């Protein structure tokens, strides 16, 4: 019988921050090209998880869906705070 009283730790390869940045830049530019307000659309996606906020053009929707929304928010907050501290 297995012991289920211990907390297991799951390790996975984290997505490099550069990949998150590259994807966000691509999504931003795609949204601009399509005539959308990129900030509003990305915020809508992050809050709702609904990929319909991101267009399929330039594979933007597929790219952003590969990254966990928490990782995207972490990257955005980290960059914002780093910029403010300089």
Curated annotation (Swiss-Prot):
Segments forming a coiled coil: none
Pfam families reported in the protein's UniProt record: IreB
Stored InterPro entries: IreB (IPR009309)
Superkingdom as given in the UniProt entry: Bacteria
Entry similarity comment: Belongs to the UPF0297 family.
PANTHER family: UPF0297 PROTEIN YRZL
Protein name according to UniProt: UPF0297 protein SSP1144
